[in-house]
């Protein structure tokens, strides 16, 4: 997979800019991404230590919305299976996510 060009990175950052201007907007963006993930894969909720015992109906994900990319106790297959959900959510960021997920998956358990 070819890395993103500087122009593509600049374009993505410009597009995301209005959605990440404040901590509140960053959290809202992250919460939306996690709602998409947990809606499609509710079994993933319990892979997050602070969400043990919760369901899609009562999960509180604001904390995770603000920390979208951190180390998680999941294996490589579990991590990589979330890729299509995030790609769907971030349709305009598809090329970036296809580039990042395999690299990040190397660091998964």
Curated annotation (Swiss-Prot):
* InterPro entries tied to this protein: Globin, Globin-like_sf, Globin/Proto
| Record's keyword terms, sorted | Heme, Iron, Metal-binding, Oxygen transport, Transport
A GO molecular function term, named singly, is: heme binding
- Globin domain location: 3-109
Q: Give the family from UniProt.
A: Belongs to the globin family.
Describe the protein's quaternary organization and the partners it interacts with: Monomer.
Give additional notes from the record. Answer: This globin lacks one of the heme-binding histidine residues found in most other globins (replaced by a tyrosine) but has a high oxygen affinity despite this change.
Q: What is this protein called?
A: Globin
UniProt function note: Oxygen binding protein.
Per the record, the domain of life is Eukaryota
* Stored Gene3D superfamilies: Globins (1.10.490.10)
